[in-house]
Amino acid sequence: LNLSKQNPDAYFILRYKKINWLHINFFKDILLEIKKAKNIKISNDYSKYNISYHLCSSSDLIIAKFTSIMDECLSLGFPVLVHDYSYNLNKTLSSCIDYKPLDIICSNFDELSDKTKKILQISQDQFENENKEGLNKYFLRTKKPDVKNKIQLIVNEVYKELNV
Protein backbone atom coordinates (compact mmCIF):
# COMPACT_ATOMS: atom_id res chain seq x y z
CA LEU A 1 0.00 0.00 0.00
CA ASN A 2 2.75 2.44 0.86
CA LEU A 3 4.45 1.87 -2.48
CA SER A 4 1.21 2.59 -4.33
CA LYS A 5 0.75 5.79 -2.31
CA GLN A 6 4.30 6.91 -3.15
CA ASN A 7 3.70 6.24 -6.86
CA PRO A 8 0.18 7.52 -7.58
CA ASP A 9 0.77 7.50 -11.35
CA ALA A 10 1.58 3.77 -11.33
CA TYR A 11 -1.06 1.05 -11.28
CA PHE A 12 -0.31 -1.90 -9.00
CA ILE A 13 -1.76 -5.36 -9.56
CA LEU A 14 -1.15 -7.81 -6.73
CA ARG A 15 -1.00 -11.46 -7.72
CA TYR A 16 -0.62 -14.20 -5.12
CA LYS A 17 -0.01 -17.91 -5.35
CA LYS A 18 -3.17 -18.49 -3.32
CA ILE A 19 -5.94 -16.11 -2.37
CA ASN A 20 -7.71 -17.97 0.42
CA TRP A 21 -6.28 -15.40 2.86
CA LEU A 22 -8.70 -12.85 1.35
CA HIS A 23 -11.47 -14.49 3.38
CA ILE A 24 -9.66 -14.29 6.72
CA ASN A 25 -11.14 -11.62 8.97
CA PHE A 26 -7.70 -10.53 10.20
CA PHE A 27 -6.97 -8.94 6.78
CA LYS A 28 -10.30 -7.09 6.52
CA ASP A 29 -8.85 -3.60 7.18
CA ILE A 30 -6.00 -4.03 4.71
CA LEU A 31 -8.38 -5.30 2.04
CA LEU A 32 -10.65 -2.32 2.63
CA GLU A 33 -7.70 0.04 2.10
CA ILE A 34 -6.81 -1.76 -1.13
CA LYS A 35 -10.41 -1.46 -2.36
CA LYS A 36 -10.40 2.29 -1.62
CA ALA A 37 -7.10 2.89 -3.42
CA LYS A 38 -7.43 4.04 -7.01
CA ASN A 39 -4.17 2.57 -8.27
CA ILE A 40 -4.08 -0.90 -6.74
CA LYS A 41 -6.09 -4.10 -7.10
CA ILE A 42 -5.77 -7.78 -6.35
CA SER A 43 -5.77 -10.14 -9.31
CA ASN A 44 -8.16 -12.86 -8.24
CA ASP A 45 -9.07 -14.61 -11.49
CA TYR A 46 -7.56 -18.07 -11.22
CA SER A 47 -9.80 -19.61 -13.88
CA LYS A 48 -7.54 -18.57 -16.75
CA TYR A 49 -4.35 -20.48 -17.42
CA ASN A 50 -1.07 -18.52 -17.30
CA ILE A 51 -2.61 -15.19 -16.30
CA SER A 52 0.56 -14.40 -14.33
CA TYR A 53 2.52 -14.43 -17.59
CA HIS A 54 0.01 -12.09 -19.20
CA LEU A 55 0.27 -9.69 -16.26
CA CYS A 56 4.07 -9.75 -16.42
CA SER A 57 4.19 -9.16 -20.16
CA SER A 58 2.11 -6.00 -19.85
CA SER A 59 3.90 -4.61 -16.77
CA ASP A 60 6.38 -1.75 -16.54
CA LEU A 61 7.88 -3.35 -13.43
CA ILE A 62 7.53 -6.73 -11.76
CA ILE A 63 8.06 -6.88 -8.00
CA ALA A 64 8.30 -10.45 -6.77
CA LYS A 65 9.72 -12.83 -4.25
CA PHE A 66 12.35 -15.28 -5.55
CA THR A 67 10.30 -17.35 -8.01
CA SER A 68 10.76 -19.07 -11.33
CA ILE A 69 8.48 -16.56 -13.06
CA MET A 70 10.71 -13.76 -11.76
CA ASP A 71 13.70 -15.50 -13.37
CA GLU A 72 11.77 -15.99 -16.60
CA CYS A 73 10.88 -12.30 -16.72
CA LEU A 74 14.49 -11.29 -16.09
CA SER A 75 15.68 -13.63 -18.82
CA LEU A 76 13.45 -11.70 -21.23
CA GLY A 77 14.82 -8.37 -20.02
CA PHE A 78 11.71 -7.28 -18.14
CA PRO A 79 12.36 -4.88 -15.24
CA VAL A 80 12.20 -6.93 -12.03
CA LEU A 81 12.79 -6.12 -8.38
CA VAL A 82 13.13 -8.91 -5.83
CA HIS A 83 11.28 -8.31 -2.57
CA ASP A 84 13.64 -10.13 -0.17
CA TYR A 85 12.35 -9.11 3.23
CA SER A 86 9.40 -9.55 5.52
CA TYR A 87 8.19 -8.13 8.80
CA ASN A 88 11.07 -9.54 10.85
CA LEU A 89 13.56 -10.83 8.24
CA ASN A 90 15.68 -9.42 5.48
CA LYS A 91 17.98 -11.02 2.94
CA THR A 92 16.16 -14.32 3.15
CA LEU A 93 17.54 -15.76 -0.10
CA SER A 94 19.82 -13.03 -1.41
CA SER A 95 22.53 -14.21 0.96
CA CYS A 96 22.71 -17.26 -1.35
CA ILE A 97 21.71 -15.73 -4.69
CA ASP A 98 22.71 -12.12 -5.25
CA TYR A 99 22.40 -11.64 -9.04
CA LYS A 100 25.37 -9.24 -9.07
CA PRO A 101 26.00 -7.04 -11.01
CA LEU A 102 22.21 -6.65 -11.30
CA ASP A 103 20.91 -4.26 -8.64
CA ILE A 104 17.49 -5.87 -8.24
CA ILE A 105 17.45 -7.17 -4.66
CA CYS A 106 15.47 -5.12 -2.12
CA SER A 107 16.24 -5.95 1.51
CA ASN A 108 13.93 -3.33 3.01
CA PHE A 109 11.13 -0.98 2.06
CA ASP A 110 13.41 2.02 1.47
CA GLU A 111 15.41 0.07 -1.12
CA LEU A 112 12.20 -1.12 -2.76
CA SER A 113 10.84 2.42 -2.87
CA ASP A 114 14.03 3.96 -4.30
CA LYS A 115 14.55 1.27 -6.93
CA THR A 116 10.88 1.34 -7.93
CA LYS A 117 11.01 5.09 -8.59
CA LYS A 118 14.20 4.69 -10.61
CA ILE A 119 12.87 1.86 -12.80
CA LEU A 120 9.49 3.52 -13.40
CA GLN A 121 11.36 6.48 -14.92
CA ILE A 122 12.99 4.39 -17.66
CA SER A 123 11.77 2.14 -20.45
CA GLN A 124 12.08 -1.64 -20.57
CA ASP A 125 14.65 -1.27 -23.37
CA GLN A 126 16.72 1.08 -21.21
CA PHE A 127 16.52 -1.33 -18.26
CA GLU A 128 17.64 -4.17 -20.52
CA ASN A 129 20.51 -2.13 -22.02
CA GLU A 130 21.72 -0.90 -18.63
CA ASN A 131 21.67 -4.45 -17.26
CA LYS A 132 22.82 -6.41 -20.31
CA GLU A 133 26.02 -7.69 -18.65
CA GLY A 134 24.19 -9.08 -15.62
CA LEU A 135 21.30 -10.48 -17.64
CA ASN A 136 23.70 -12.26 -19.99
CA LYS A 137 25.66 -13.61 -17.02
CA TYR A 138 22.65 -15.44 -15.58
CA PHE A 139 20.48 -16.24 -18.58
CA LEU A 140 20.78 -17.70 -22.07
CA ARG A 141 19.74 -14.61 -24.00
CA THR A 142 21.05 -15.15 -27.52
CA LYS A 143 18.58 -15.52 -30.35
CA LYS A 144 19.95 -18.97 -31.21
CA PRO A 145 21.33 -20.25 -27.93
CA ASP A 146 24.03 -22.87 -28.15
CA VAL A 147 23.04 -24.38 -24.82
CA LYS A 148 25.68 -27.11 -24.77
CA ASN A 149 28.58 -24.68 -25.29
CA LYS A 150 27.14 -22.15 -22.80
CA ILE A 151 26.80 -24.85 -20.12
CA GLN A 152 30.30 -26.12 -20.86
CA LEU A 153 31.74 -22.61 -20.47
CA ILE A 154 29.95 -22.16 -17.14
CA VAL A 155 31.12 -25.55 -15.86
CA ASN A 156 34.70 -24.72 -16.91
CA GLU A 157 34.52 -21.38 -15.08
CA VAL A 158 33.31 -23.12 -11.92
CA TYR A 159 36.14 -25.65 -12.15
CA LYS A 160 38.69 -22.85 -12.59
CA GLU A 161 37.32 -21.06 -9.52
CA LEU A 162 37.56 -24.28 -7.52
CA ASN A 163 41.06 -25.00 -8.87
CA VAL A 164 39.95 -28.49 -9.91
At which residue positions do the language-model features occur?
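A short helix->loop->beta-strand "cap" motif at the edges of active sites that frequently abuts
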Residues: 9-10, 78
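Catalytic core segments in nucleotide and nucleic-acid processing enzymes
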Residues: 10-12, 50
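Donor nucleotide-activated moiety binding/catalytic core segment of transferases
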Residues: 19-71, 76
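Catalytic binding pocket for nucleotide-activated donors in carbohydrate/polymer assembly enzymes
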Residues: 68-142
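C-terminal alpha-helical cap of glycosyltransferases
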Residues: 141-164
